[in-house]
């Protein structure tokens, strides 16, 4: 097709932030049941004496939740999840190119691997501090079960914000920031840098054009790498965030208890749904992100030319 291509039009910061937020929200809506299954598998084993149903695998978990708690339970915490994407994903993804440009300002060469990694670390860290309260609420709503007469801790998203702030203080909304920071910078670096490098390699070597198939394959590879790298930290983060006050003394204490009580394999609980979720999330998000950036930039340039 003729006309402008992605390389012809450089998206503005506003276009990148908006495109990242919308693409991340769309990906979250589609993959949220997989995320809920991942959370349920990760917190399973915290209370060995509990009579709550045991989950087995991704499909087994999803089936069990639907059968015992209803389909909508798979989307418990979705409003907080969307708030998280708008507040954090838009920043960690939308600011990535801008931070790279800042780090390489005045240099005629392309961004180095070091600058890509530093950009991923920076945007991932900023996003965590801003979006942590939404992560806490999302995880707790996903983890709570209504089985066997267990009274849920929270009745909804805003009820969860209020109760956590009231009973645990405002710091309760930032509980688990340390493991989430570790997880997010690992995922952000691995995800964005791998995607960037794979896309560049495919295009530079004329394997794939800078279009949907290239974005799809690059995103899938990035999702696999990010999942494998972040799984242990992700399990600790989920356990620590979901725990009531006093269950764990600290993040290292949480990690030690997981290791002592359940063994090293517990750090990879929910690995399959994590990959299914992050892999599919990456594909949807990156493909939509690239297309939105391209179309919005072309529309903006067309409007500028018309005026």
Swiss-Prot record:
UniProt KW Amino-acid biosynthesis keyword: no
Places the protein is found: Mitochondrion inner membrane
Tissue specificity: Brown adipose tissue.
Positions annotated as Solcar repeat: 11-102, 111-201, 210-295
Regulation of this protein's activity per its record: Has no constitutive proton transporter activity and has to be activated by long-chain fatty acids/LCFAs. Inhibited by purine nucleotides. Both purine nucleotides and LCFAs bind the cytosolic side of the transporter and directly compete to activate or inhibit it. Activated by noradrenaline and reactive oxygen species. Despite lacking canonical translational encoding for selenocysteine, a small pool of the protein has been observed to selectively incorporate selenocysteine at 'Cys-254'.
Residue ranges crossing the lipid bilayer per the database entry: 11-32, 74-96, 117-133, 179-195, 213-232, 267-289
Residues in the Mitochondrial matrix compartment per record: 33-73, 134-178, 233-266
Keywords, comma-separated and alphabetical: Diabetes mellitus, Ion channel, Ion transport, Membrane, Mitochondrion, Mitochondrion inner membrane, Obesity, Oxidation, Repeat, Transmembrane, Transmembrane helix, Transport
GO process annotations (BP): adaptive thermogenesis; brown fat cell differentiation; cellular response to cold; cellular response to dehydroepiandrosterone; cellular response to fatty acid; cellular response to hormone stimulus; cellular response to reactive oxygen species; diet induced thermogenesis
Molecular functions (GO terms): cardiolipin binding; GDP binding; GTP binding; long-chain fatty acid binding; oxidative phosphorylation uncoupler activity; proton transmembrane transporter activity; purine ribonucleotide binding; transmembrane transporter activity
Effect caused by changing residue 269 to S: Severely reduced H(+) transmembrane transport activity
Modified residues (Cysteine sulfenic acid (-SOH)): 254
Outcome after substituting residue 56 to S: Severely reduced H(+) transmembrane transport activity
Top-rank taxon, per record: Eukaryota
Catalytic activity: H(+)(in) = H(+)(out)
Role of this protein: Mitochondrial protein responsible for thermogenic respiration, a specialized capacity of brown adipose tissue and beige fat that participates in non-shivering adaptive thermogenesis to temperature and diet variations and more generally to the regulation of energy balance. Functions as a long-chain fatty acid/LCFA and proton symporter, simultaneously transporting one LCFA and one proton through the inner mitochondrial membrane. However, LCFAs remaining associated with the transporter via their hydrophobic tails, it results in an apparent transport of protons activated by LCFAs.
Homology family: Belongs to the mitochondrial carrier (TC 2.A.29) family.
Oligomer status and interactors: Most probably functions as a monomer. Binds one purine nucleotide per monomer. However, has also been suggested to function as a homodimer or a homotetramer. Tightly associates with cardiolipin in the mitochondrion inner membrane; may stabilize and regulate its activity.
Record PANTHER family: MITOCHONDRIAL DICARBOXYLATE CARRIER-RELATED
Name the record gives this protein: Mitochondrial brown fat uncoupling protein 1
Organism (species): Homo sapiens (Human)
């Amino acid at each position: 097709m003729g006309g402008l291509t992605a390389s012809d039009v450089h998206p503005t910061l506003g276009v990148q932030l908006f495109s990242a937020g919308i693409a991340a929200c769309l990906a979250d809506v589609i993959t949220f049941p997989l995320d809920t299954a991942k959370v349920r598998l990760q917190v399973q084993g915290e209370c060995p004496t509990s009579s709550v149903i045991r989950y087995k695998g991704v499909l087994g978990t999803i089936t069990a939740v639907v059968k015992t708690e209803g389909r909508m339970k798979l989307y418990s915490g979705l409003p907080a999840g969307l708030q998280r994407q708008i507040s954090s994903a838009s920043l960690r993804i939308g600011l990535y190119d801008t931070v790279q440009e800042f780090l390489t300002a005045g240099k005629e060469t392309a961004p180095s691997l070091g600058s890509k990694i530093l950009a991923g670390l920076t945007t991932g860290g900023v996003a965590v501090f801003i979006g942590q309260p939404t992560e806490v609420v999302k995880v707790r709503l996903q983890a709570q079960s209504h089985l066997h007469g267990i009274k849920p801790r929270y009745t909804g998203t805003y009820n969860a914000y209020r109760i956590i702030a009231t009973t645990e203080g405002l710091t309760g909304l930032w509980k688990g920031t340390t493991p989430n920071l570790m997880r997010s910078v690992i995922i952000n670096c691995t995800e964005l840098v791998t995607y960037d490098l794979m896309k560049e390699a495919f295009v530079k070597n004329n394997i794939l054009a800078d279009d949907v198939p290239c974005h799809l394959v690059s995103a899938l590879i990035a999702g696999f790498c990010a999942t494998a790298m972040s799984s242990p930290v992700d399990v600790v983060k989920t356990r620590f965030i979901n725990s009531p006050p006093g269950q764990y003394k600290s993040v290292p204490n949480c990690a030690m208890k997981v290791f002592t009580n359940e063994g090293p394999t517990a750090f990879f609980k929910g690995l399959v749904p994590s990959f299914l979720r992050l892999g599919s999330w990456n594909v949807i998000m990156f493909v939509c992100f690239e297309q939105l950036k391209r179309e919005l930039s072309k529309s903006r340039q067309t409007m500028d030319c018309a005026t």
